[in-house]
Amino acid sequence: MSKNLLIELGLEELPAYVVTPSEKQLGERLATFLTENRLSFEDIQTFSTPRRLAVRVSGLAAQQTDLTEDFKGPAKKIALDADGNFSKAAQGFVRGKGLTTDAIEFREVKGEEYVYVTKHEAGKPAKEVLLGVTEVLSAMTFPVSMHWANNSFEYIRPVHTLTVLLDDEALDLDFLDIHSGRVSRGHRFLGKETTITSADSYEDDLRSQFVIADAKERQEMIVEQIKTLEVEQGVQVDIDEDLLNEVLNLVEFPTAFMGSFEAKYLDVPEEVLVTSMKNHQRYFVVRDQEGRLMPNFVSVRNGNDQAIENVIKGNEKVLVARLEDGEFFWREDQKLQIADLVAKLTNVTFHEKIGSLAEHMDRTRVIAASLAKEANLSAEEEAAVDRAAQIYKFDLLTGMVGEFDELQGIMGEKYALLSGEDAAVATAIREHYLPDAAGGALPETKVGAVLALADKLDTLLSFFSVGLIPSGSNDPYALRRATQGIVRILDHFGWRIPMDKLVDSLYDLSFDSLAYTNKADVMNFIRARVDKMMGKAAPKDIREAILASSTFVVPEMLAVAEALVKASHTENYKPAVESLSRAFNLAEKADASVHVDPSLFENEQENTLFAAIQGLTLAGSAAQQLEQVFVLSPVINDFFDNTMVMAEDQALKNNRLAILSDLVSKAKTIAAFNQLNTK
């Protein structure tokens, strides 16, 4: 008869960002534990609040399945001595399996007999196996851990309770400094300690103490309550998904409410108000039916609606203090001069090993000028890039950005416009931070994109030059994100700028502030980001073939990846790749100093292939270029069928290898086809 298992770990308040991943991890680790211990189950449901992580297993087998395993030992000639008795090797083998030599049998494997034993292990009761479930809790990993009291161990937060129930039976075990029981803690203010009656009664037992254990249910409650407020007040609430996920992990019993603030604060830029509400106070933004910001907010209380008016007033008071700061900085910052702020950037450190922000901007300006030409910007756009590069970090010294650092770039755009800067310059100041997250929005203007590329390139080269290179998962300066941004921007705008030549040109630049070094590491790092971009859809062999090509133009590489993936599902892919691979492998033996001499051709196939190569222009899209190469497959095969490439005559051999080298030279601009797998 199957059973239901409940495990709940009661902790001190968890950071909101840890709750959901930890809930998922607990479920996955327990599933692995049960599977490895031969305990079958029907379903696993996980629970979490800021003060608990829990999991319930339904339909858990009452006993492990029996285990029968065959073990292969030494060969028979080693297992038996000259008298036919079992040797020490055979005896040691069976002893290690907990058996005797009586269990030995011989089985033939590839013409030779070997010792085999079969071990039967009866399944243990689930209750006995589950005493080891603390291994699951101990194996949990967290981004941060802590000590408490005088304990030597670490965990995400102090543990207060552990409940492990098999149906309604409490299992007896210890974890850290806690002994298991069936007592759980209710809501910190509204509830009290409560007894969990059984695995099935878990949610109801906690609900009676004002705890909604199911995160999905809490989320549904929050959304439903907000929707009710929308209808009652005739407004629209921005239910930001990230904020919603954070808020539901801050509360155990949610109650949404609406507060307000004076309309005068609406004169402050919307981004300031939204940042104050969303990022600093965890409030949802309220708009009218036309989408205009309203002097209201929605927050979620961790509790019921008792004394809710006092709660609303308290939240309003806290928000007004934030808005007062924003209004003050908005007013005072407009008195500042951009030129004065830029001059002060010489005293702001970019990084202690690299220099000041002003020096970073100087290098960025030079790189931006080069990129603007590579991207074929107009003279007007080039001028905008140059002006933006001179001032684009000035807002870091404004009071607003000092208080709300999330607004860097955003306030720079607004202050630049107020100071009379060109709109393209102002937009570039905002856009140079983009993309600011994996998959985040990209710059929309060419001027902003060029400035973003230049800023990210100098950042990458500067940090690598002083040895601050990411390793493993450690990337404190977000260089992977910056480089991924470079790749995405180049692809988005379709700029066919050869990255290898571009980086070479940057290393030729001379700056008093810093000398770029570690070029090989930089190139490998950029290749890894391109590889990651292709990895979303392309298998490893296709990615490696493209990265080994003679072209390092990001949009083309990504387009070739897509074209090769599509082509790999067609009938002519395998024969085409195989013929090209053969050509690539032989071409490696070619003498680079030898050029094709048609007078040495001995058959029509040499003439035909050479003419086809001469006419190969590789024009059009990546798919079209790929087709232009693939269509040569019959010609290549005909050449191989009728021509001895590695002829004894050295001149003939070198000439034929030179033909293949010419083919490879052109085809390799697409991919190194001998890296592709056709098996």
Swiss-Prot record:
One of its GO terms (biological process) is glycyl-tRNA aminoacylation. GO terms for molecular function: ATP binding; glycine-tRNA ligase activity. GO terms for cellular component: cytosol. Pfam families: tRNA_synt_2f (PF02092). Keywords: Aminoacyl-tRNA synthetase, ATP-binding, Cytoplasm, Ligase, Nucleotide-binding, Protein biosynthesis. It catalyses: tRNA(Gly) + glycine + ATP = glycyl-tRNA(Gly) + AMP + diphosphate. SUPFAM superfamilies: HD-domain/PDEase-like. It is found in: Cytoplasm. Its EC number is 6.1.1.14. Tetramer of two alpha and two beta subunits. Belongs to the class-II aminoacyl-tRNA synthetase family. HAMAP family: Gly_tRNA_synth_beta (MF_00255). This is Glycine--tRNA ligase beta subunit. It comes from Streptococcus pyogenes serotype M6 (strain ATCC BAA-946 / MGAS10394). The gene is glyS.
